[in-house]
C-alpha cells in the first residue's frame, strides 16, 4: 500500500509539471474535438506531430520542410504549390521523317549486333562478362557468328601482373564450346594471352586493322613464400607455358619448338607479319582499298596537288 501511494503521488507531481510546461495554445488545441475543414485538420496534424519526416509549412526546426525544399517534399499538403516528383521521359528525335527513340548505350548496341568487345586486361570480372555474353548469344541464335573485337594487353599492363593466365584459358574453352563461329578482330593491341584469343577464332575470319599490334610472350609470374611453395608455383607456371605453346601451335600451324623459341622474349608482329606467321588470316582495310588511303589521295582527287 505504501508503495502504491508513493507511486500515485509521483505520477500526480509529474503530471502537474508536464501541464505547466505545455503551452496553453497546445492544450487548447487538444481540447477542440472538431475542425472547421480538412485543411485545418491537416495543419493541426502537422503542428501536433513534429517529426523530421513530416512535411508541411510550419516553422518548427523539427519539420521536414527544413530538411528539403517544399517542392520536393512528397508529404506537402499545400494546395497552393504544385507537387514535384521524379518523372522518367523518353524524348523522341527525328531521323528523316520518322520519330525514333534515343539510341541505347554503346555496349548494348554492340551486343545487340553480336559484337563482344574485349577492351581491358583479362581480370576475373572481364572474363565473367565475356563468358556470359558468349553463352547468351549462343542461346539467342546458334547459327549467326559472334564477333570478338580485341584491344587488350592480356593479363599484364605496363609490366604489372593483373590477372591469372587461366582467365584466357576460360575464354578460350568457351570459344570452342559454343556452336556459333567466332570471328576475331584486333582493333588495337592483342598482346600475350589476348593474342591467343585472337588466333583461336574461326579459320579464315581472324583479322586485324592496319595499325594494330600483336605480340606473343611466355606467361609471367612472381612468387614468394617458403621454398616448397615457390617450387610448386614454378611447376604450375611451366605447365601453363607448355599448354599455351600447344594451343599456339595448333592454331598457327608451326611446331611447338619454334613457338617456344619465339616466346622466350616478347615477339611483336605488325598485321602483315602476323598474317605471314599464321596468327591471323587477313588485314582489314577501309572500303577505298590499301592503295587509295590517306590525305594525299584525297588531295589528289580534289585536284589540290
UniProtKB/Swiss-Prot annotation:
Keyword set, alphabetical order: Chloroplast, Plastid, Transit peptide
Superkingdom field: Eukaryota
Keyword Chloroplast found: yes
Protein location: Plastid, Chloroplast
Gene3D superfamilies (UniProt xref): 2-enoyl-CoA Hydratase, Chain A, domain 1
Keyword Chloroplast: yes
InterPro entries, per database record: ClpP, ClpP/crotonase-like_dom_sf, ClpP/TepA
GO molecular function terms listed in the Swiss-Prot or TrEMBL record: ATP-dependent peptidase activity; serine-type endopeptidase activity
Pfam families attached to this UniProt entry: CLP_protease
Alphabetical GO biological process terms: proteolysis; regulation of gene expression; response to reactive oxygen species
Any one GO cellular component localisation term in the record: cytosol
Effects seen without this gene: Embryo lethal. Delayed embryogenesis and albino embryos, with seedling development blocked in the cotyledon stage. Under heterotrophic growth conditions, seedlings develop into small albino to virescent seedlings.
Role played: Involved in plastid protein homeostasis.
Family: Belongs to the peptidase S14 family.
Assembly and binders: Component of the chloroplastic Clp protease core complex which consist of at least 16 proteins: CLPP4 (3 copies), CLPP5 (3 copies), CLPR4 (2 copies), ClpP1 (1 copy), CLPP6 (1 copy), CLPR2 (1 copy), CLPT1 (1 copy), CLPT2 (1 copy) and 3 copies of CLPP3 and/or CLPR1 and/or CLPR3. The core complex is organized in two heptameric rings, one containing CLPP3,4,5,6 in a 1:2:3:1 ratio and the other CLPP1 and CLPR1,2,3,4 in a 3:1:1:1:1 ratio.
Family matches, as PANTHER family: ATP-DEPENDENT CLP PROTEASE PROTEOLYTIC SUBUNIT, ATP-DEPENDENT CLP PROTEASE PROTEOLYTIC SUBUNIT-RELATED PROTEIN 4, CHLOROPLASTIC
Entry protein name: ATP-dependent Clp protease proteolytic subunit-related protein 4, chloroplastic
Name of the encoding gene: CLPR4
Amino acid at each position: 500500500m505504501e508503495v502504491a501511494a508513493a507511486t500515485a503521488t509521483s505520477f500526480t507531481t509529474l503530471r502537474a509539471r508536464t501541464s505547466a510546461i505545455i503551452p496553453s495554445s497546445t492544450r487548447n488545441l487538444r481540447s477542440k474535438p472538431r475542425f472547421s475543414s480538412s485543411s485545418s485538420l491537416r495543419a493541426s496534424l502537422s503542428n501536433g506531430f513534429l517529426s523530421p519526416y513530416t512535411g508541411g509549412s510550419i516553422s518548427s526546426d523539427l519539420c521536414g520542410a527544413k530538411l528539403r525544399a517544399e517542392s520536393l517534399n512528397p508529404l506537402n499538403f499545400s494546395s497552393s504549390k504544385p507537387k514535384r516528383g521524379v518523372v522518367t521521359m523518353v524524348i523522341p528525335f527525328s531521323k528523316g521523317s520518322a520519330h525514333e527513340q534515343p539510341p541505347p548505350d554503346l555496349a548494348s548496341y554492340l551486343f545487340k549486333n553480336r559484337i563482344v568487345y574485349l577492351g581491358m586486361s583479362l581480370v576475373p570480372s572481364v572474363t565473367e562478362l565475356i563468358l556470359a555474353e558468349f553463352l547468351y548469344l549462343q542461346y539467342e541464335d546458334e547459327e549467326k557468328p559472334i564477333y570478338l573485337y580485341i584491344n587488350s594487353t592480356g593479363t599484364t599492363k605496363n609490366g604489372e601482373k593483373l590477372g591469372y593466365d587461366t582467365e584466357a584459358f576460360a575464354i578460350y574453352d568457351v570459344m570452342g564450346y559454343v556452336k556459333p563461329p567466332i570471328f576475331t578482330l584486333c582493333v588495337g593491341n592483342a598482346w600475350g594471352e589476348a593474342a591467343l584469343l585472337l588466333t583461336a577464332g574461326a579459320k579464315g575470319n581472324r583479322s586485324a586493322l592496319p595499325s594494330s599490334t600483336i605480340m606473343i610472350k611466355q606467361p609471367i609470374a612472381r612468387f614468394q613464400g617458403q621454398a616448397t611453395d615457390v617450387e610448386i608455383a614454378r611447376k604450375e607456371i611451366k605447365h601453363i607455358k607448355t599448354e599455351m605453346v600447344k594451343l599456339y601451335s595448333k592454331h598457327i600451324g608451326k611446331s611447338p619448338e619454334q613457338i617456344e623459341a619465339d616466346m622466350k622474349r616478347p615477339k611483336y608482329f605488325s598485321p602483315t607479319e602476323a598474317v605471314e606467321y599464321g596468327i591471323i588470316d587477313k588485314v582489314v582495310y577501309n572500303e577505298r582499298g590499301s592503295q587509295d588511303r590517306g590525305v594525299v589521295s584525297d588531295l589528289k582527287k580534289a585536284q589540290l596537288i
